[in-house]
Swiss-Prot record:
Disulfide bonds: none annotated. Competitively inhibited by lysophosphatidic acid. It is found in: Endoplasmic reticulum membrane; Cytoplasm. It is a multi-pass membrane protein. Catalyzes the hydrolysis of the vinyl ether bond of choline or ethanolamine lysoplasmalogens, forming fatty aldehyde and glycerophosphocholine or glycerophosphoethanolamine, respectively and is specific for the sn-2-deacylated (lyso) form of plasmalogen. It catalyses: a 1-O-(1Z-alkenyl)-sn-glycero-3-phosphocholine + H2O = a 2,3-saturated aldehyde + sn-glycerol 3-phosphocholine; a 1-O-(1Z-alkenyl)-sn-glycero-3-phosphoethanolamine + H2O = a 2,3-saturated aldehyde + sn-glycero-3-phosphoethanolamine. Belongs to the TMEM86 family. Its EC number is 3.3.2.2. It is an enzyme of class 3 (hydrolase). InterPro entries: TMEM86B-like. This is Lysoplasmalogenase TMEM86B. The keyword Ion transport does not apply. GO terms for cellular component: cytoplasm; endoplasmic reticulum membrane; membrane.
Amino acid sequence: MDARKEGLPLETLFSDQYPQVRRWLAPFILACSLYFLLWIPVDQPSWVSALIKCQPILCLVVFLWAVAPGGSSTWLLQGALVCSAVGDACLIWPEAFFYGTAAFSVAHLFYLGAFGLTPLQPGLLLCTTLASLTYYSFLLLHLEQGMVLPVMAYGLILNSMLWRSLVWGGSASWGAVLFTFSDGVLAWDTFVYSLPFARLVTMSTYYAAQLLLILSALRNPGLKTH
């Protein structure tokens, strides 16, 4: 894929020229609002709380189906969203942490497929890797032995997704940065020490990240008009 095809500028996407974008994004915004308004305590895991948490991501799956042009890129982005929703549901229950991590790892692989591997830009990979290693070198000090391998494997995949998204550019790059930040806050709050407003920061940046990542699929003239 051509990294220059990063999608239409956001101000264009949300203009009167493309009313279908705003119309099909409304369910996502409402689902996000519902999640933050209900704010179900994390110590009360249930299928209801899992559904409420997953709803915004599932709305984005429908959004892509309704608005984005067809093709492998759109399907890969939808696959990433579905896996993310599975990961969201798993992380409701602490005992399903490994399943959630695996689901998000597959989601990032879908994003990797959507953004491609050309142009390579190894210098950018070096920069993201050095930043990731700095963070994970501190995080490793607080991980139990059984957590080291899965967390590091996930970090490697996340870093790869960040690299390719930055090469792709546009909203995808901002989405990947927010996703990485969200995961960083979540990991620090989970394994190092409790951070104030960690859940609010994590979930708000996470939902924004997913939206920005999938907006990269919207390219003119392929936008659907219904």
